[in-house]
């Protein structure tokens, strides 16, 4: 990682995937899980190849996922590392080529890249005031303009930290809702409360929340089975969907339950009279 050693990436790919193509298949499977819909990997080191492509947006998704791993985050923040071979006879020193670590306050990394077709590239991350942002610049100049990627990334980060802030999602208190239950041992069921989360928004963003919750349910009801959802849209684009669950399970009523309900109703009438 520190020296961008392409041969090592191939060796790791062959060890973990059995072959480069086998490892690429694992990479593509993971990319799909992360929502990287415009990415297809062929090489493990990012070198140019037919059918090997991605986008800045997808690289940011990958970066956001990767920096949640403490070992990975520690690695990309390492500026240099020295080690010896197994015999202790030979010593080696590695230097991180990520100048962004020293160039930008709050920088976390992450990785540089260059090919003749892609130009200078950089996936970056930075943290300020409890907010972590990721960025990606592709084709940010060609030789001799090696430093363009640093200034371009700085501009992106400055923009992000200036305009975006943490915003709590205004979710209604679902615990107050009572959903009628047909043919159940109970007539109503409440909903599990949803803890409001935060997201990054700018003052010019529009937030829309769509509740899809039924007006009535039929027994049986299982508390671990979702009965609705809440969708959150920023600028009319879905960015998060949360499932809604009942607070308890309710079994379907039987004949004896019906008789008991009728008797209770008669007792209530008798007491009132």
Protein language model regions, located:
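Domain-terminus/edge residues, biased toward the C-terminal soluble/receptor-binding domains
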Residues: 36-37, 51-53, 57-58, 63-273
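Mid-domain, small-residue-enriched loop/turn segments at the edges of structured enzyme/sensor domains
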Residues: 13-67
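Mid-bilayer segments of alpha-helical transmembrane spans in multi-pass integral membrane proteins
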Residues: 7-8
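Short helix- or helix-capping micro-motifs
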Residues: 1-4
């Amino acid at each position: 990682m520190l020296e961008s050693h392409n041969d090592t990436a191939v060796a790791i790919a062959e060890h973990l995937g059995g072959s480069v193509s086998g490892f690429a298949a694992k990479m593509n499977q993971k990319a799909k899980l992360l929502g990287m819909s415009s990415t297809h990997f062929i090489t493990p080191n990012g070198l140019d190849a037919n059918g090997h492509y991605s986008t800045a947006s997808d690289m940011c998704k990958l970066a956001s996922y990767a920096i949640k791993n403490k070992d990975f985050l520690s690695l990309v923040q390492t500026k240099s590392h020295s080690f010896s071979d197994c015999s202790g006879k030979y010593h080696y020193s590695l230097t991180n080529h990520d100048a962004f670590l020293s160039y930008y306050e709050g920088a976390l990394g992450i990785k540089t890249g260059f090919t003749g077709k892609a130009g200078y590239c950089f996936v970056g991350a930075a943290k300020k005031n409890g907010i972590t942002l990721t960025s990606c610049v592709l084709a940010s100049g060609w030789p001799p303009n090696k430093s363009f990627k640093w200034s371009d990334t700085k501009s992106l980060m400055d923009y992000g930290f200036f305009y975006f802030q943490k915003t709590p999602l205004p979710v209604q208190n679902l615990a107050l809702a009572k959903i009628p239950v047909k043919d159940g041992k109970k007539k109503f069921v409440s909903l599990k409360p949803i803890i409001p989360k935060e997201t990054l928004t700018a003052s010019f963003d529009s937030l829309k929340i769509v509740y899809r919750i039924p007006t009535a349910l039929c027994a049986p009801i299982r508390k671990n089975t979702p009965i609705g959802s809440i969708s959150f849209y920023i600028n009319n684009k879905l960015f998060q969907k949360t499932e809604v669950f009942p607070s308890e399970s309710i079994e379907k009523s039987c004949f004896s339950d019906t008789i008991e309900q009728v008797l209770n109703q008669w007792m209530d009438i008798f007491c009132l009279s």
